[in-house]
Swiss-Prot record:
Homodimer. Within each dimer, one monomer is responsible for RNA recognition and catalysis, while the other monomer binds to the replacement base PreQ1. Transmembrane segments: none annotated. This is Queuine tRNA-ribosyltransferase. Keywords: Glycosyltransferase, Metal-binding, Queuosine biosynthesis, Transferase, tRNA processing, Zinc. Its cofactor is Zn(2+). GO terms for cellular component: cytosol. The gene is tgt. The lineage of its organism: Bacteria, Pseudomonadati, Campylobacterota, Epsilonproteobacteria, Campylobacterales. Belongs to the queuine tRNA-ribosyltransferase family. Pfam families: TGT.
Amino acid sequence: MQVTLQAQDGGARALSLKLAHSEVQTPVFMPVGTQGCVKALDSRDMSEILNAQIILVNTYHMYLRIGIERLKNFGGIARFAHFDRSYLSDSGGFQAFSLNKNAKVTNEGVAFKSHIDGSKHFFSPEYVLDIQYALNSDIMMVLDDLVGLPSSEERIADSIARTSDWAQKSLIYHQSQKARGLGLNNNLFAIIQGGVNEHFRTLCAKQLVDMGDFDGFAIGGLAVGETSEQMYKTISFTTPLMPVNKPRYLMGVGTPENIIESIALGVDMFDCVMPTRNARNATLFTHFGKINIKAAIFSNDQSPIDELCDCYTCQHFTRAYLCHLFRSQEMTYYRLASLHNLHYYLNLMREAREAILQGTFSAYRSSFYALREMEIPNNEY
């Protein structure tokens, strides 16, 4: 991966990431394609209509649904899904924990049963990379030990010790693969854990950065029960610990407000199910805030979802039509609503990037909140 810092405005950064399948411009939002597709959309929607640069795919689900050998035979996820741009694959560890009440975590990895058929499986740091090699994703995530919040200091200490150990094993394995001429196009990111505790975050970050050869670094373990202020404070003391010449990825976050604040604090990459999940549940994002499209007030509203939006849905359909489709449980609703919400998120990234390049990100941030009639958060964390 070739990383170029194209501009910086305060803490906000605009990078170019040259990956095997495509070049990615940051700040970037990655739509979540859990099982090889973004729900209700296909690869043409993603590339031609939304112009998405990179999609997140879930290692756990692809492993259980398809398996390593079939993924290899298909030539990886990009060929299988006919999306000729980049993919980031997560490690699948979170799903192994969260979807299996009896999952057992040891220093060697995670033992779990398939939520599909009850079959037994084991994820080691090395094996999750084997799955991601089969996916042939541009960016692979190491296996990490995520803790929910609040958690005891003892549990957080165990988490960062295990996370660092697994990261070291992953790095050694990845380097051995590259020495054999394998995995040369697959970049490996480490994940910084530590809850909202500055001491533990600093300790984990130092251990991972000192390993030296990761292609990027992620902040994990947020948006799991902490307040927004705790989230922003944690990001503010974590990003300075991350190398300036590597991309910074905030995992699983979040709301448009979360993303704008995190960009200001130096984060480059984001993913979240929120735009598509909210779309399926009648919540649509606009420049002026969220609307609940199933509400009766919209049943005769002939305006677009968002008058400032130029997405496919807003160009062709009205609020009244979307309200009708949702209330009628028409499947077309899910596509049109998902297209709108994802366009909103992706356009937010494009606007933020342009502001950074022009040196006007602070003014852009102010206008973002002014349209919503919201106070600008105090970012003196």
